[in-house]
Swiss-Prot record:
GO terms for biological process: rRNA base methylation. Specifically methylates the N4 position of cytidine in position 1402 (C1402) of 16S rRNA. This is Ribosomal RNA small subunit methyltransferase H. The lineage of its organism: Bacteria, Pseudomonadati, Pseudomonadota, Gammaproteobacteria, Lysobacterales. Belongs to the methyltransferase superfamily. RsmH family. Its main location: cytoplasm.
Length: 313
């Protein structure tokens, strides 16, 4: 059965693929978006696919190594500037967050439901695993990450429990950490049983984002995408939590809207918009949610690169 990504139809419409265009899928995953783009490209079109995850890249090579239109590169889309020349792309797609294969395979260490090694790295060869990081850093740093990236209100209590636990035995398994967090949440006034989500959801999110530098990569990748897009090219981003979406929304607004001015200060330079927002933020409808409950938090935003000469006229 072919995997259909979240908000697939809306993403394809947002990209507005032209037959001989050049496109980037910066988060290959299972390849659903890449296949959609290739169906719309002609023989003269080109698709660059990237992913941090070596397993995703292996899948891309199995699927598309014989297609001369496809160029496959292992790495974060934050490295886009090294691969694409300025104004060389007609469309860029980022489908953010953790992919279904990463969540569904316990050995990847992303799931708090299925037991596996406490890893959480999208590229297992890069940086520290979640277990290594939790064993090394201070209580304060753990709390800061859970609060900043997981928006976890009980971040200090959870961090304190982690440090106390690791003093006696190492945290090496996902369910081990999930059960520890659940025990902390059950002792709070809010109570884990009163929440609709698993008590470890926000903490796992925060640790995962930190370990993979997801928000840092997103900010760098958005700037690189803007530089690489041709005038008229489209930027399509699907985010899955408020931190990602806020960065995307603010990035588009910063390059599309005139910043507020202080009347008491002289105007130094004329603002030149580089992007145009295309429509409003899009969310999955009820029909899609029935098929794919993971789409509930997805938000899709589209922007179009402007011609600077046209923008200043």
């Amino acid at each position: 059965m072919t995997h259909v990504p979240v908000l697939y139809t809306q993403a394809m419409e947002g990209l507005r693929v032209v037959e001989n265009g050049t496109y980037l899928d910066g988060t290959f995953g299972r390849g659903g978006h890449a296949r959609g783009v290739l169906q719309l490209l002609g023989p003269g079109g080109r698709l660059l696919v990237m992913d941090k995850d070596p397993e995703a890249i292996a899948m891309a090579e199995r699927a598309f190594s014989c297609d001369p239109r496809v160029v496959i590169r292992h790495g974060s889309f934050a490295l886009l500037a090294q691969l694409a020349a300025p104004q060389s792309l007609d469309g860029v797609l980022f489908d953010l967050g953790v992919s279904s294969p990463q969540l569904d395979v316990p050995e990847r260490g992303f799931s708090f439901v299925k037991d596996g090694p406490l890893d959480m790295r999208m590229d297992p060869e890069m940086g520290e695993s979640a277990a290594q990081w939790l064993a090394r850093v201070s209580e304060r740093e753990i709390a800061d990450v859970l609060w900043t990236y997981g928006e976890e209100k009980q971040s200090r209590r959870i961090a304190r429990a982690i440090v106390a636990y690791r003093a006696n035995q190492p945290l090496l398994r996902t369910v081990q950490l999930a059960e520890l967090i659940a025990s902390v949440m059950l002792r709070t006034k809010s109570g884990a049983c009163k929440s609709r989500i698993h008590p470890a959801t926000r903490s796992f999110q925060g640790i995962r984002i930190h370990v993979n530098r997801e928000l840092v990569d997103l900010e760098v990748g958005l700037e690189a995408a803007l530089a690489a897009l041709r005038p008229g090219g489209r930027l399509v981003v699907i985010s899955f939590h408020s931190l990602e979406d806020r960065i995307v929304k603010q990035f588009i607004s910063r390059h599309a809207k005139v910043p507020p001015t202080n009347r008491r200060l002289p105007e130094v330079q004329t603002f030149v918009p580089l992007l145009r927002m295309i429509g409003r933020a899009i969310k999955a409808d009820e029909d899609e949610l029935e098929v794919n409950p993971r789409a509930r938090s997805a938000v899709l935003r589209v922007a179009e690169k402007l011609d600077v000469l046209e923008a200043v006229r």
